[in-house]
From Swiss-Prot:
GO terms for molecular function: nucleic acid binding; tRNA (adenine-N6)-methyltransferase activity. Belongs to the methyltransferase superfamily. tRNA (adenine-N(6)-)-methyltransferase family. CDD domains: AdoMet_MTases (cd02440). It comes from the Bacteria. Its EC number is 2.1.1.223. This is tRNA1(Val) (adenine(37)-N6)-methyltransferase. Keywords: Cytoplasm, Methyltransferase, S-adenosyl-L-methionine, Transferase, tRNA processing. The keyword Methyltransferase applies. GO terms for biological process: methylation; tRNA processing.
Length: 245
């Protein structure tokens, strides 16, 4: 049985340590989220914020990667997705660490009295245009409810002085997002350009920004080798999560 056929069941995705149901979420578990959750720097992290958690995928991946005393706040605007995220968390090994908030990040963030040293988001990136099949999918895919400038401003208000704000975006949109972040005082510290294989140009980019200036480390990740199997670098990054890797 293929990997995709053996890990997809009951409208969800089974990882080594947890299961993510996503049938009530506009955006399903996919490579973008898995890449971001496996890639984000977690050294010395003390508190995590997941903006737009959806099914709870990123919060769960980061719970697996961090110490048991690290709390994670996961904020989701869509009530159906937030409820499913709560269920996924409840059935995971970390229900005591992850709190799912059904709220708009723009109203939730100003009420917080603590700051986060890791903020993570798989944000919407399409400009409003062609309508989606459902309002929930439109909300998840389009920037009308949370544009990038607002997202960057919220992250700036919530982050510690030496924290990281991490996102995954399509390559060209990521370049524009980076320029916007730099204009707002952020510093780009990590960048990984992601290509499907060696013959193709990068189609996604993983970005980590910080309020603190410092050297920017950049590299390239290829998902599949010439034999169409996962590359060594992609395997090393994600093997703690995929069942059959």
């Amino acid at each position: 049985m293929s990997q995709s056929g053996s890990v997809l069941r009951r409208n969800g995705f089974t990882f080594k340590q947890f299961f993510v149901a996503h049938d009530r979420c506009a955006m399903k578990v996919g490579t973008d989220g898995i890449l971001l959750g496996a890639w984000a720097p977690v050294a010395d992290v003390k508190r995590i914020l997941d903006i737009g958690t959806g099914s709870g995928l990123l919060a769960l991946m980061l719970a697996q990667r961090t110490d048991d005393n690290v709390p994670i706040d996961a904020v989701e605007l869509d009530a159906g997705a937030a409820m499913q995220a709560q269920e996924n968390v409840a059935h995971s090994p970390w229900p005591h660490r992850i709190t799912v908030h059904t709220d708009d990040i723009q109203s939730w963030a100003p009420r917080q009295t603590v700051r986060f040293d890791l903020i993570i988001s798989n944000p919407p990136y399409y400009e409003p245009g062609v309508e989606c099949a459902t309002p929930q999918r439109e909300q998840a895919r389009y920037t009308a409810t949370l544009d990038h400038q607002t997202l960057l401003a919220i992250a700036a208000d919530c982050i510690t002085e030496d924290g990281f704000f991490c996102v995954v975006l399509p390559e060209q949109i990521g370049n524009a997002f980076t320029q916007q972040a730099l204009n707002m005082g952020w510093h780009l510290r990590l960048r990984t350009d992601v290509a499907e294989n060696e013959a193709r140009l990068p189609h996604r980019v993983l970005l980590a920004f910080s309020p603190q200036a410092g050297e920017c480390f950049s590299d390239r990740l290829v998902i599949r080798g010439s034999d169409q199997h996962y590359s060594e670098s992609y395997t090393a990054l994600t093997q703690a999560f995929y069942l059959f890797m």
